[in-house]
Amino acid sequence: MQNSHSGVNQLGGVFVNGRPLPDSTRQKIVELAHSGARPCDISRILQVSNGCVSKILGRYYETGSIRPRAIGGSKPRVATPEVVNKIAHYKRECPSIFAWEIRDRLLSEGVCTNDNIPSVSSINRVLRNLASDKQQMGSEGMYDKLRMLNGQTATWGSRPGWYPGTSVPGQPAQEGCQPQEGVGENTNSISSNGEDSDEAQMRLQLKRKLQRNRTSFTQEQIEALEKEFERTHYPDVFARERLAAKIDLPEARIQVWFSNRRAKWRREEKLRNQRRQASNTPSHIPISSSFSASVYQPIPQPTTPVSSFTSGSMLGRTDTALTNSYSALPPMPSFTMGNNLPMQPPVPSQTSSYSCMLPTSPSVNGRSYDTYTPPHMQTHMNSQPMGTSGTTSTGLISPGVSVPVQVPGSEPDMSQYWPRLQ
């Protein structure tokens, strides 16, 4: 043991590169594991790396041995010709067999021991080599047939090779008709080709059968598996082994079943979420581009120009004083109170809402107050001059705004009315 090869690990333990742990340390690792200590605790107690502890325990659980593997040089070959022949025999008996099943049969039949049993990856490598050898043998047989056919066609044509030479139309074809005694040989070769084709068909069928048949579960097994799946979607190795002993199934089959069942559960959960979202989404109401006239009534437009409302005729009388006073005003814009009011029936409280009155002319006598007329009823009344009787008209409050007012029909005391708004 050289000092240059020794060292101290991260936990403070001493190790030697390339050399296994002492048997005493290995025995302590196994004893602590049997006492219930976790690998991380064993690593801290014995100052051995966690990877080393896990590797020793894994090999102990798998083979029951704590001895180290062979060190130095190449590992002994475990895939001996005898083991390879056995693997090929098992594969021929059951083409859908798994590598771990072959490994179990090698152990149960005593072909190998725990020390020289090949790993699952080694068995898979042997199976791949056997399949490639079969394919290579089949391709070599096909090449032999092609070479044989090439040799026969060389006697049929005028020149040797893969493709016989074509005869010229003017050239007599005696050479192609001469070999008559080789007909029997040709029939023999055809029959041999038929046998080889049958073998090729059998090989193809065997290759198709390499896929493992689906495992069929009984109702009791399915119920037990579903019950365990309801408890947990990811059972540990102990739960799988307990379930395997209960329903008489290999632990690997149970692991594959749980993997497939989880995939099915994810698909079903996705569909449930889609249905839930579809049920929560409200149905779309089509929006109509046209509105009913009963809901939104059109606002009537004035039929006469705005300039006509500036004259005295819009008051419904021919008073010269009013005509002179209103004719000097600028033209009114089209936005008037009558046009902007909503179309609603008159309310009794609105009949006296407008109390601003216009002064009457001294020449007008014997007039009475008229009731308030809504704007939608006076749209066509503004353009027609009325008589000398009192009518509803619009009076100016400010430039650009006109409101309907009541014109007094008599000469009462003007002190009870508001003065004209300036």
UniProtKB/Swiss-Prot annotation:
Cell location: Nucleus
Keywords, in A-Z order: Developmental protein, DNA-binding, Homeobox, Nucleus, Paired box, Transcription, Transcription regulation
Region called PAI subdomain, residue ranges: 7-63
GO molecular function, one term: DNA-binding transcription factor activity, RNA polymerase II-specific
Renumbered residue ranges of the record's region Disordered: 170-200, 268-289
Superkingdom field: Eukaryota
GO cellular component: nucleus
SMART domains membership: HOX (SM00389), PAX (SM00351)
InterPro entries: HD, Homeobox_CS, Homeodomain-like_sf, PAIRED_DNA-bd_dom, Paired_dom, PAX_fam, WH-like_DNA-bd_sf
The UniProt record lists the keyword DNA-binding: yes
Region (RED subdomain): 82-130
Compositionally biased spans, kind Polar residues: 185-194
Principal cellular location given in the protein's record: nucleus
The keyword Mitochondrion is assigned to this record: no
The entry's DNA-binding region: 4-130, 210-269
An example Gene Ontology biological process: brain development
Similarity-based family: Belongs to the paired homeobox family.
Function text: May be a transcription factor with important functions in eye and nasal development.
Protein name (database record): Paired box protein Pax-6
Species annotation: Xenopus laevis (African clawed frog)
Designated gene of the protein: pax6
